[in-house]
Each structure stands twice: as structure tokens, then as C-alpha cells.
Amino acid sequence: MREALDIRVHGIVQGVGFRPFVYRAAKHNLIDGWVLNGIDGVRIHAEGEASDLDDFVLELSEHAPAASRVEEILLDEVPLEGFDSFEIRHSDETSSDATTLISPDLATCDDCIRELFDPDDRRYRYPFINCTNCGPRYTIIDALPYDRPSTSMAAFPMCPTCAHEYADPADRRFHAQPDACFDCGPHIYWKETADAATPTDSDVHENADTNARTRTLRDRYPELEWGSDLTASDAIIERACSWLHDGRILAVKGLGGFHLVCDAANPETLAELRARKRREGKAFAVMAPSLDAVRACCAVSPEEERLLVSPAHPIVLLKKKPGAVFAAGLADDLSELGVMLPYTPLQHLMLAEFGSMLVMTSGNVHDEPIQTDDEAAWKALAGIADAFVGNDRAIETRFDDSVARVIRVGGEAAVQLIRRARGFAPMPIKLARPTNGTGQEHADAPIILAVGPEQKNVLCLLRGDDAFASQHIGDMENAETFDAWLEAKDRLERLFDAKPTVIARDMHPEYLTSKWADEVRRTHGIRVMDAQHHHAHIVSAMAEHGIDDAVIGVAFDGTGYGFDGAIWGGEILIANRVDFERFANLTYVPMPGGAAAVKHPERMAFGALWAFDLIDHPGARPLKDRLGDAANVCASMMERGLNAPSTSSVGRIFDALSALVGICAHARYEGEAAVLFEAAIDGCETRDAYEIAIVKNAATAESTAHDTSVVLLDSEPLFRGVLDDLTAGTPVHVIAAKAHNAFVQAIVQTCLLAQAAYDIRTVVLSGGVFMNRYLIEHTTASLMEAGFTVAINRELPPNDGGLSYGQAAVASARLGSE
């Protein structure tokens, strides 16, 4: 007996070939009816025998396209309408509940790569080849549902051949919205920086909105050298690679913005790029032409290989092979290199032509967001790039490359994200929300906007139990980055039809995002909820793992506003999602000069030695000699209590130790001193450790559980031990290993004390210091050996890039407890 079902599929089901998959599954299971894209996902009307309908629904759930993610399938019995075939219908734009999830951009698939290099294929060497399994998604979407008119591909009407493929259910490009070829475009162009470009008058129209959607850069600048056919396109690629071989720097437009590109093996060009971009020491990421090229210079485990070739194609931090030679200025003094493989057709063509590794670094001016608009890039990057390889497909939102690594946790490989952007965002991260006393359902829960921190900003929009963490935005230090933050916020709210009614923010009153939240509260009356920085770190990992009960939370990072007004960063908390107690913290040390101590770690070292009365230790003499007169200035600030804030930050202690042993006196980028201190371990396997004393803290009448810990982690013995070893001539790699081991032991010992006091055996590790591979791998192993269950961030970075998710989780929990 025939029956009919109304089927709604929620998840990442648009832009990933889901409707063609449904069509084929319907044909396979003898189902009649239709499928369409709705604002709330994919909707299907299915008619057939009951057993065939069961098989059809099972196929939908178990054999969906690899790039899709089915969150739920809702079934309702409906009356038969008498269909005798199955069809794909035009999208439904009338649904009122915008619950569709949008796919991130996907790296070029193997089928498209084969066609790209097949001389007999009509898309041979076409720089924008794609299909339903790969290509741009989120970076070209302007509105939902995901159809070509709602993307930046609206400006490129399909040629008859592409239109036929698009309409053929048996074709891999059936309903592939970015589908294109040389005949219909888009196309690349070549522009030398010295060449002026003047837009034509024809770009001015009465309807500016229509113009923006249907006019292209080529309409505005027809005089540029355009790669309109195979010959012209190849000529641009060949010239670009010739310039790169000659030591030039190019700006090349990618999926989410421009890259600055140069020969990774040319030290003179690397030095020039650093000078032009004002990027003094931070390592460059490289793009390799193949896995074999990566294996030639880096150790690649099976897990790292899978990450490199995954649909996200992130930059993967790999250990350099012993004896591998790298150009000066690429990733000096580091044991790891950031490597990625080509993920766009143009990159495949350029890397194949060039033949070896290229530097691919974000196309931006120092401390500003990545450039996405061609005309703006010509101006902003004119002082950096010698020429531009751009195109006339508009980028709807800026995206940097994601960065990840594989670490060992409890003997098993785990992916740790360092920067979550292209290939991952805007996929939501589930955040189970508690109901309040009225049994409020998730869908009716307030929409929360978590505005994120000051550094490595990512914002997060919580709708129901879907947390939409934005792409990496950057450090909120200038108007340009704040504008990018506003753009990302507005885009998330618009695409997911989610207007926040609650704002979650960091406690720090001077953060730009905190001030923005204050202004919104004042002008719109929206509720604003504060989340302490380190509590949000811990809750970010708790929420990822669905942990509701209290945990021992170890939050180690560089900074964070504390309840006592000091700069925290070495915290061990007893925390649930709603609140926390400060169980332990690293002893405070002064930061002479405040922010200057971050840029000049020798000041940090001097401050620690001054606080611990170790200035006159013989091992401190080289530090004082290097500081010279600055030592007296630092001492004066600390004695008078002027511009010498106190901090418990582990990040700052690693900075101080790095400077003390002579590794890094001046940090050229955020975290450099600590990064180099970890790199100095250089395979040292000593189990010896300095001491970090655990002592009972003294409370005062004003003390609270929020600001006064039960015990202190006293780092005076650590610094004394380092000074003793410096005096004795102990090698720096041994000192670095012993210092790291000291923190591992202190964490385990303190967690054992907390477990005895609170009967908690789950430990959560979060905060930027846990990007330190040595520390997180040794700490997780030691905690597990001690019988603890350990949770770390998996879908988000442990650094401030995961903080907004934690802010949203804290606010949600507090609302649920009211």
C-alpha cells in the first residue's frame, strides 16, 4: 500500500550535492514526489510503498554525501497526492524558520583535479573548476536558500553546456551552484602594481543593488589582462610563476581573500616580504605541490596526512625532518613548519607550474584584516605585492586559512585547532542547553551573541543548541578589524535569521567588544552578561564534551581580567558552567612597564627575579648586563608601584624564562618568547623537573572564592633552580625541559589536592598556553596516569579563538539556572 511522507532534513545539506543525492536515492528506491531547498534545510515529499519509504529514509541518513552533515530527519505522514515521478523543484523561500546550516568552503576534489589536468576535458586547466563535492560555499553566499542567484556567481549566467550539466541528475554537477567554465566565467586577471586601472563609466546604474549582483570586475576594468580562454589563462599563470622564480612577490586571490605569495626557498625574497609586510619574525606558512614534497622535508604521520588532504585542507604544523634545509627567514629556530596543500584549482595550476613550495601568507597590511575586494587590495597591498593575480568572482566574506596540528592525548592522535576559519566555519558546534524551571525548549531559548575577546577574536551566535562560531577575525586593535568583526556579526545574524536578545562578553571593561556591548545595552536595552575570561576557557571545553558536573579546570594563558583586578593566567578552578571557585593560582609577579613587558620579555624576567629577591643571584648577572640602565628603570617602577601590574600568567612566566636563559629578549610577535622556549627543548627527554612549591594561601576579610585561591603555586623555586643551572653551565635544552616538567608536575599535584577536597576526577585543560605541544601532551599523559579523566578543546582552539563559545555556554547555563 502506497503512503506519503513529508521529510525535512536539517544540517549541512545545501551546497553539498544533497538534492541530487536525494533524487538518486528516490529513483533507487522507487519513490515519487519532489525535493527542494528551503530556508530551514531540505524538504522532501515522498510517495511509495511503506517498505520502499523505509529504505529511502535509511539511505538518506546512512549514505549522505561526504561533505554534508545530517543533524536530524523529521518525518510526518501526509495525504497522497498521486505523483508518478520524482523531481527537483525550485527553492522554497517562504519557510519561516531559518535553521539551514551552510557548508564551509571545500578543497578541490580528486575528480575535479583529474579533469583539471586532463587535456581532453572541456575544463582543462580552468582555474575555477568545481562540482557538488568541492569549491566555494560560505564565501560566495549572500542569502539563503543556497541557489546561484543568492551567490556571487549570479553575475555569471551559465553557458548551454554548463546549464545542461546543472539540469542532469546523472551529472556530478547537477545543481552545483558555482558550476562554471571558460565560456561562462569567472576568469583570472593579471595586473602589475605599477599599472594604473581606471573603471569604466558603464558600472554606474540606477539600481545599485542589481548592479552589485550582476556586474563583475571585468565589466568595470575590461582593459586588464583577462584569462578568458585556456591560452590567455595559462599565459597569466606562466608569467606569475616566472615572476616568483625571479624573486618577486605576488598577491593572489583565493577563496576567502588574497594571499601574499613568494618562493619559499629564496631568503632574499623572504626578507623583502618581511620588510614590506612589517612581519619581523613570525614563521610563514607554505603550500607544497604534493604530499611527496611535504614528506621530503617534514615528518608526516598517517593522522597528519589525513588532516592535510581532508576537505578543509588546513595549514598543518609538522615537525621538520632532521637535516632538512629551509631558507633563512622562513621558520627560523622552530621545530615545526606550517604546511598546506593546494585547495583551489588555481593553486593546483600554480604549484604544478612552479614545481616547489611557495609561501602563502595572508594578504593584509600589518595588524589589519585580510583583503577580499580587488580594488581595495590594489591600494592596500601596493607597497607589498609586485603584481596581482585576481579574478572577477566576488568574495562575500573574508576567511583566513585554518591552522591545526595533531597531538597525542592518552596515546591516541587528536586534532588540535590553532585557528578555526576556512574549511571549518561556519559549521555549528553543538551546545546542549539546560532548560529552566518552566521547561523551556531549546528552540525557544534566548539567542545569545558572545562577542569574544580582544585577541584572536572569534564571535559566537548561539541559536537553540547550535553555536555558530565565526571565522577567525583577529586582534581587535584597530578600526579595520572592528569593522570586520561587525561584518561577521551582521552576516551570521542575517544568514541564520537570529537576532540576539542576550549578549555575553568578557569582564575586561576596556575591550572594544565590551564597550560595544555596553553601548548596545544603553541604546537597545539588551541584557549583557559577563563571563570571566578563564572560566569561559574552561567552560568552552566542558560544553564541547557535554560536561555539566563540576570539573577541575586548568586555565593557563597569557592574560585575562581577574576579579581582583589583576592579570590572571595561571588558574586552577573548581568550575561548573554557571560559576567557579579559584582553587589555585600561580604567585603574582610584576610586569614592569605593563604591556612593554610582553614585548620585552627581559623586563618580565627582571620583574620575577625582583619579586623573588633573586636579583643578586650570580645566574642573574647576564640578564642585568643585557638590560643595562633599563634594569634601574624597571626596579624604580616596581618599588614605587607605578605601571607594574601584577600577573599570575603562565604565558608571562614562560616569556620570563625564555629571556632569562638568553633565548628571546625582544618578542617580534605575540607569544614568540614562549614558543622559542618550547622549541629549545629540542627532543630533550629528561624527566627531571624544577620545583613549583604548593603553599596554603592567606585569606583576608575581603577575600571571596572568586578572587582568593586555596593554595598558591609558588614559582620562586623554579626561578632559583634555573639560575643555579645557568651558573653551573647546564645546557639550555635541559633547562627548558625541566621548566616544562615543573608545570606538568605542579598541575598533577594540585589536581590531586583538588580531587581529595572536592571528589572530582575530571580535569579540563584550556587556554593559549596549551598550544604548547610538549606541555599538553605530557600533562594529559601524567593526569591520565594519575587516574583523571581529561577533556581538552577539540572543535575549537584552546586559545582565545575558542573563548566566545565558552562565553555563550556560561550565559546559557546562567539563564537556565534562573
Per-segment meaning from a language model:
Residues 542-610, 615-618, 639, 647-648, ...:
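Active-site histidine-anchored catalytic micro-motif
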Residues 77, 249, 257-320:
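A phosphate-binding glycine/aspartate-rich beta-alpha loop in the early core of alpha/beta enzymes
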Residues 251, 497-509, 528, 758-769:
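Short glycine-rich phosphate-binding loop at a beta-alpha junction
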Residues 1-178, 182, 186-189:
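Intrinsically disordered, low-complexity, mixed-charge
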